[in-house]
Amino acid sequence: MKYPKYYIGPMSKNVVDCVMKHGQQHSVGLIPSRRQVDYCGGYVNQWNTRTFSEYVGDTVLLCRDHGGELQGKDPDDGVESFNEDCKYFDLIHVDPFRASKTIKDAAERTIQIIKQLSVQNSNLMFEVGTEEAIFKYEPEQLTWFLTYLSMELTENQFNQIKYAVVQSGTRLDLSTRTNIGNFNNKRLDKFIQVVKSFDLMSKEHNGDYLTDSFDVEVRFERGLDAINIAPEYGQVESEYYLEGCKKDGDLFERLFVICYNSGKWKKWVKDINRISQDQLIMTCCHYVLSDQQFIEEIKSNFPNADKLIQKRISSKLKLLNEQTKNYCI
Protein backbone atom coordinates (compact mmCIF):
# COMPACT_ATOMS: atom_id res chain seq x y z
CA MET A 1 0.00 0.00 0.00
CA LYS A 2 1.14 3.53 -0.80
CA TYR A 3 0.49 5.54 2.34
CA PRO A 4 -0.68 9.15 1.90
CA LYS A 5 1.56 12.02 2.93
CA TYR A 6 -1.44 14.23 3.64
CA TYR A 7 -4.83 13.58 5.16
CA ILE A 8 -7.70 16.05 4.72
CA GLY A 9 -10.64 16.65 7.04
CA PRO A 10 -14.01 16.13 5.29
CA MET A 11 -15.28 19.56 6.30
CA SER A 12 -18.04 19.55 3.67
CA LYS A 13 -19.33 17.55 0.73
CA ASN A 14 -17.41 19.86 -1.60
CA VAL A 15 -14.16 19.06 0.21
CA VAL A 16 -14.92 15.33 0.01
CA ASP A 17 -15.71 15.52 -3.70
CA CYS A 18 -12.46 17.38 -4.40
CA VAL A 19 -10.39 14.93 -2.35
CA MET A 20 -12.00 12.00 -4.17
CA LYS A 21 -11.15 13.54 -7.54
CA HIS A 22 -7.62 14.35 -6.34
CA GLY A 23 -7.32 10.75 -5.15
CA GLN A 24 -7.69 9.46 -8.70
CA GLN A 25 -4.13 10.63 -9.38
CA HIS A 26 -2.54 11.11 -5.96
CA SER A 27 -2.45 9.19 -2.69
CA VAL A 28 -4.59 11.03 -0.12
CA GLY A 29 -6.59 10.22 3.00
CA LEU A 30 -9.79 11.54 4.57
CA ILE A 31 -9.88 11.97 8.35
CA PRO A 32 -13.46 12.33 9.64
CA SER A 33 -13.75 13.24 13.30
CA ARG A 34 -16.66 11.80 15.23
CA ARG A 35 -18.41 15.17 15.21
CA GLN A 36 -18.23 15.28 11.43
CA VAL A 37 -19.22 11.70 10.64
CA ASP A 38 -20.21 9.05 13.17
CA TYR A 39 -22.40 5.98 13.53
CA CYS A 40 -25.27 8.26 14.58
CA GLY A 41 -24.64 11.00 12.01
CA GLY A 42 -22.65 14.23 12.03
CA TYR A 43 -22.60 17.79 10.80
CA VAL A 44 -21.15 16.97 7.35
CA ASN A 45 -23.89 16.30 4.79
CA GLN A 46 -25.91 14.23 7.31
CA TRP A 47 -23.60 11.29 6.61
CA ASN A 48 -23.16 8.48 9.08
CA THR A 49 -20.16 6.14 9.07
CA ARG A 50 -21.74 3.69 6.63
CA THR A 51 -23.21 6.18 4.16
CA PHE A 52 -20.01 8.24 4.16
CA SER A 53 -17.91 5.16 3.45
CA GLU A 54 -20.26 4.03 0.70
CA TYR A 55 -20.14 7.48 -0.91
CA VAL A 56 -16.35 7.69 -0.91
CA GLY A 57 -15.76 4.07 -1.87
CA ASP A 58 -12.15 3.03 -2.39
CA THR A 59 -10.97 6.28 -4.01
CA VAL A 60 -9.03 7.37 -0.91
CA LEU A 61 -7.83 5.89 2.37
CA LEU A 62 -10.39 6.42 5.15
CA CYS A 63 -9.06 7.16 8.62
CA ARG A 64 -11.13 7.76 11.73
CA ASP A 65 -9.61 10.83 13.37
CA HIS A 66 -9.63 10.97 17.19
CA GLY A 67 -11.67 7.84 17.71
CA GLY A 68 -12.71 6.99 21.23
CA GLU A 69 -14.24 8.11 24.49
CA LEU A 70 -15.40 11.74 24.86
CA GLN A 71 -14.58 12.48 21.22
CA GLY A 72 -18.13 12.57 19.85
CA LYS A 73 -20.88 15.16 19.86
CA ASP A 74 -22.17 13.82 23.19
CA PRO A 75 -20.13 12.19 26.00
CA ASP A 76 -19.89 8.41 25.58
CA ASP A 77 -17.44 5.51 25.83
CA GLY A 78 -16.87 5.41 22.07
CA VAL A 79 -17.66 1.69 21.78
CA GLU A 80 -20.55 1.94 19.30
CA SER A 81 -18.54 4.33 17.18
CA PHE A 82 -15.54 1.98 17.09
CA ASN A 83 -17.79 -0.97 16.18
CA GLU A 84 -18.96 0.85 13.05
CA ASP A 85 -15.49 2.17 12.25
CA CYS A 86 -14.19 -1.41 12.15
CA LYS A 87 -16.60 -2.23 9.33
CA TYR A 88 -15.95 0.73 7.08
CA PHE A 89 -12.61 2.46 7.73
CA ASP A 90 -9.08 1.43 6.73
CA LEU A 91 -7.26 3.17 9.58
CA ILE A 92 -8.41 4.16 13.07
CA HIS A 93 -6.75 6.81 15.19
CA VAL A 94 -7.10 5.36 18.70
CA ASP A 95 -7.22 8.43 20.93
CA PRO A 96 -8.28 7.89 24.56
CA PHE A 97 -6.17 10.82 25.77
CA ARG A 98 -9.11 13.15 26.38
CA ALA A 99 -10.38 10.63 28.93
CA SER A 100 -6.93 9.91 30.41
CA LYS A 101 -5.19 11.62 33.31
CA THR A 102 -1.73 10.17 32.67
CA ILE A 103 0.15 8.77 29.71
CA LYS A 104 0.12 5.34 31.38
CA ASP A 105 -3.66 5.52 31.59
CA ALA A 106 -3.76 6.45 27.89
CA ALA A 107 -1.43 3.57 27.03
CA GLU A 108 -3.56 1.03 28.89
CA ARG A 109 -6.72 2.30 27.22
CA THR A 110 -5.01 2.23 23.82
CA ILE A 111 -3.93 -1.38 24.35
CA GLN A 112 -7.41 -2.46 25.39
CA ILE A 113 -8.98 -0.81 22.35
CA ILE A 114 -6.48 -2.24 19.85
CA LYS A 115 -6.95 -5.73 21.27
CA GLN A 116 -10.71 -5.48 20.90
CA LEU A 117 -10.72 -3.94 17.44
CA SER A 118 -8.08 -6.25 15.98
CA VAL A 119 -10.35 -9.19 16.80
CA GLN A 120 -13.24 -7.56 14.94
CA ASN A 121 -11.09 -6.72 11.90
CA SER A 122 -7.60 -8.14 11.55
CA ASN A 123 -6.95 -5.93 8.50
CA LEU A 124 -7.41 -2.68 10.40
CA MET A 125 -4.52 -0.26 10.67
CA PHE A 126 -4.03 2.00 13.68
CA GLU A 127 -2.64 5.41 14.55
CA VAL A 128 -1.68 6.08 18.17
CA GLY A 129 -0.86 9.12 20.27
CA THR A 130 -2.56 12.49 20.12
CA GLU A 131 -2.05 16.16 19.37
CA GLU A 132 -0.59 18.75 21.69
CA ALA A 133 -3.92 20.54 22.17
CA ILE A 134 -5.38 17.43 23.83
CA PHE A 135 -2.42 15.99 25.78
CA LYS A 136 1.11 17.30 25.44
CA TYR A 137 3.95 14.78 25.74
CA GLU A 138 7.69 14.75 25.23
CA PRO A 139 9.73 12.45 22.94
CA GLU A 140 10.85 10.46 25.98
CA GLN A 141 7.22 9.91 26.99
CA LEU A 142 6.33 8.75 23.49
CA THR A 143 9.23 6.28 23.71
CA TRP A 144 7.80 4.88 26.92
CA PHE A 145 4.28 4.82 25.45
CA LEU A 146 5.29 2.88 22.33
CA THR A 147 7.52 0.53 24.32
CA TYR A 148 4.63 -0.29 26.63
CA LEU A 149 2.36 -0.96 23.67
CA SER A 150 4.96 -3.23 22.05
CA MET A 151 5.27 -5.24 25.27
CA GLU A 152 1.55 -5.63 25.96
CA LEU A 153 0.29 -6.26 22.42
CA THR A 154 1.03 -9.34 20.35
CA GLU A 155 3.48 -8.90 17.50
CA ASN A 156 0.64 -8.99 14.97
CA GLN A 157 -1.39 -6.43 16.91
CA PHE A 158 1.54 -4.04 17.23
CA ASN A 159 2.29 -4.45 13.52
CA GLN A 160 -1.21 -3.15 12.79
CA ILE A 161 -0.04 0.22 14.16
CA LYS A 162 1.21 2.32 11.26
CA TYR A 163 1.40 5.89 12.63
CA ALA A 164 2.39 7.61 15.85
CA VAL A 165 1.45 11.26 16.39
CA VAL A 166 4.35 13.65 16.89
CA GLN A 167 4.14 17.12 18.42
CA SER A 168 6.48 19.73 16.95
CA GLY A 169 4.38 22.76 17.84
CA THR A 170 1.11 23.29 15.98
CA ARG A 171 -1.92 25.21 17.20
CA LEU A 172 -4.77 26.76 15.26
CA ASP A 173 -6.49 30.13 15.42
CA LEU A 174 -9.46 29.84 13.07
CA SER A 175 -10.50 33.46 13.56
CA THR A 176 -7.25 34.75 12.03
CA ARG A 177 -6.62 31.66 9.89
CA THR A 178 -3.14 31.18 11.24
CA ASN A 179 -1.08 28.42 12.82
CA ILE A 180 0.07 29.98 16.07
CA GLY A 181 2.03 26.97 17.30
CA ASN A 182 5.66 27.42 18.31
CA PHE A 183 7.43 25.14 15.83
CA ASN A 184 10.55 23.49 17.23
CA ASN A 185 12.63 21.67 14.62
CA LYS A 186 14.86 19.94 17.19
CA ARG A 187 11.78 18.66 18.99
CA LEU A 188 10.43 17.33 15.70
CA ASP A 189 13.75 15.62 14.95
CA LYS A 190 13.64 13.82 18.31
CA PHE A 191 10.05 12.70 17.80
CA ILE A 192 10.81 11.38 14.32
CA GLN A 193 13.79 9.42 15.64
CA VAL A 194 11.58 7.84 18.30
CA VAL A 195 8.89 6.83 15.83
CA LYS A 196 11.35 5.41 13.32
CA SER A 197 12.99 3.31 16.04
CA PHE A 198 9.70 1.41 16.29
CA ASP A 199 9.41 1.08 12.49
CA LEU A 200 6.38 3.36 12.48
CA MET A 201 5.52 6.45 10.46
CA SER A 202 5.33 9.91 12.01
CA LYS A 203 2.18 11.99 11.68
CA GLU A 204 1.54 15.60 12.71
CA HIS A 205 -1.92 16.99 13.41
CA ASN A 206 -3.17 20.56 12.91
CA GLY A 207 -1.08 21.19 9.82
CA ASP A 208 -3.39 23.98 8.65
CA TYR A 209 -2.18 27.32 7.26
CA LEU A 210 1.37 26.08 6.66
CA THR A 211 1.34 25.52 2.90
CA ASP A 212 1.57 29.14 1.74
CA SER A 213 4.67 29.73 3.89
CA PHE A 214 6.25 26.40 2.83
CA ASP A 215 6.22 25.25 6.46
CA VAL A 216 4.70 21.92 5.41
CA GLU A 217 7.71 21.32 3.17
CA VAL A 218 10.08 22.19 6.04
CA ARG A 219 8.57 19.40 8.13
CA PHE A 220 8.84 16.84 5.36
CA GLU A 221 12.44 17.83 4.73
CA ARG A 222 13.18 16.85 8.32
CA GLY A 223 11.60 13.43 7.84
CA LEU A 224 7.93 13.81 8.73
CA ASP A 225 5.88 11.11 6.99
CA ALA A 226 2.34 12.53 7.04
CA ILE A 227 0.29 15.54 8.08
CA ASN A 228 -3.39 16.22 8.89
CA ILE A 229 -5.11 19.34 7.58
CA ALA A 230 -8.78 20.09 8.24
CA PRO A 231 -10.40 23.48 9.09
CA GLU A 232 -8.35 25.29 6.44
CA TYR A 233 -10.22 23.44 3.71
CA GLY A 234 -13.63 24.11 5.22
CA GLN A 235 -12.79 27.79 5.43
CA VAL A 236 -12.34 27.94 1.66
CA GLU A 237 -16.09 27.39 1.43
CA SER A 238 -16.81 29.74 4.32
CA GLU A 239 -14.78 32.46 2.61
CA TYR A 240 -16.77 32.09 -0.59
CA TYR A 241 -20.07 32.64 1.19
CA LEU A 242 -18.68 35.47 3.31
CA GLU A 243 -17.45 37.30 0.22
CA GLY A 244 -20.78 36.86 -1.53
CA CYS A 245 -22.93 37.82 1.44
CA LYS A 246 -20.95 40.98 2.15
CA LYS A 247 -22.30 42.41 -1.09
CA ASP A 248 -25.78 42.39 0.47
CA GLY A 249 -26.20 43.76 4.00
CA ASP A 250 -29.32 41.72 4.75
CA LEU A 251 -27.74 38.51 3.50
CA PHE A 252 -24.61 39.13 5.55
CA GLU A 253 -26.69 39.69 8.68
CA ARG A 254 -28.56 36.43 8.11
CA LEU A 255 -25.29 34.54 7.66
CA PHE A 256 -23.88 36.05 10.84
CA VAL A 257 -26.99 35.18 12.87
CA ILE A 258 -26.95 31.57 11.62
CA CYS A 259 -23.29 31.19 12.56
CA TYR A 260 -23.64 32.95 15.90
CA ASN A 261 -26.73 30.96 16.92
CA SER A 262 -24.97 27.69 16.10
CA GLY A 263 -22.68 28.26 19.08
CA LYS A 264 -19.92 26.39 17.25
CA TRP A 265 -17.56 29.34 17.59
CA LYS A 266 -17.35 28.72 21.34
CA LYS A 267 -14.88 25.85 20.82
CA TRP A 268 -12.41 28.23 19.18
CA VAL A 269 -13.11 31.68 20.65
CA LYS A 270 -12.78 32.48 24.35
CA ASP A 271 -13.70 36.17 24.15
CA ILE A 272 -16.18 36.99 21.40
CA ASN A 273 -15.59 40.70 21.91
CA ARG A 274 -12.08 40.31 20.51
CA ILE A 275 -13.18 39.12 17.07
CA SER A 276 -15.17 40.74 14.27
CA GLN A 277 -18.35 39.43 12.69
CA ASP A 278 -16.32 38.33 9.68
CA GLN A 279 -13.99 36.34 11.93
CA LEU A 280 -16.86 34.65 13.74
CA ILE A 281 -18.30 33.56 10.41
CA MET A 282 -14.93 32.25 9.24
CA THR A 283 -14.51 30.37 12.51
CA CYS A 284 -17.69 28.34 12.41
CA CYS A 285 -19.51 28.63 9.08
CA HIS A 286 -18.27 25.20 8.00
CA TYR A 287 -20.30 23.63 10.82
CA VAL A 288 -23.61 24.86 9.35
CA LEU A 289 -23.10 24.23 5.63
CA SER A 290 -25.47 21.24 5.71
CA ASP A 291 -28.10 22.89 7.92
CA GLN A 292 -31.43 23.41 6.19
CA GLN A 293 -31.62 27.04 7.31
CA PHE A 294 -28.24 27.79 5.74
CA ILE A 295 -29.19 26.02 2.51
CA GLU A 296 -32.52 27.86 2.22
CA GLU A 297 -31.44 31.33 3.34
CA ILE A 298 -27.84 31.53 2.13
CA LYS A 299 -26.76 28.87 -0.37
CA SER A 300 -29.92 29.26 -2.47
CA ASN A 301 -28.68 32.72 -3.45
CA PHE A 302 -25.53 31.28 -5.06
CA PRO A 303 -26.53 28.81 -7.81
CA ASN A 304 -22.94 28.23 -9.02
CA ALA A 305 -21.44 27.97 -5.55
CA ASP A 306 -20.36 24.32 -5.56
CA LYS A 307 -18.50 24.58 -8.87
CA LEU A 308 -16.62 27.73 -7.86
CA ILE A 309 -15.84 26.45 -4.35
CA GLN A 310 -14.49 23.16 -5.67
CA LYS A 311 -12.20 25.03 -8.03
CA ARG A 312 -10.66 26.85 -5.06
CA ILE A 313 -10.32 23.68 -2.99
CA SER A 314 -8.72 21.78 -5.87
CA SER A 315 -6.14 24.54 -6.31
CA LYS A 316 -5.20 24.27 -2.64
CA LEU A 317 -4.84 20.48 -2.93
CA LYS A 318 -2.58 20.87 -5.97
CA LEU A 319 -0.32 23.27 -4.07
CA LEU A 320 -0.10 20.85 -1.13
CA ASN A 321 0.81 18.02 -3.47
CA GLU A 322 3.52 20.11 -5.14
CA GLN A 323 5.15 20.79 -1.78
CA THR A 324 5.15 17.15 -0.66
CA LYS A 325 5.60 15.13 -3.86
CA ASN A 326 9.41 14.94 -3.63
CA TYR A 327 9.44 13.30 -0.21
CA CYS A 328 9.20 9.53 0.08
CA ILE A 329 7.74 7.56 2.96
Model-derived regions, located:
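Short hydrophobic alpha-helical runs that function as membrane-insertion/retention elements
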Residues: 29-30, 61, 91-94, 225-231
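N-terminal capping/small domains of soluble enzymes
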Residues: 1-45
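Conserved, mostly hydrophobic/aromatic
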Residues: 19, 65, 128, 219
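Generic enzyme active-site microenvironment
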Residues: 63, 93, 127-130, 203
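Active-site beta->alpha loop and helix N-cap motifs at the rims of alpha/beta catalytic domains
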Residues: 34-120
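Active-site capping/gating regions of soluble enzymes
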Residues: 2-13, 75, 88, 105-122, ...
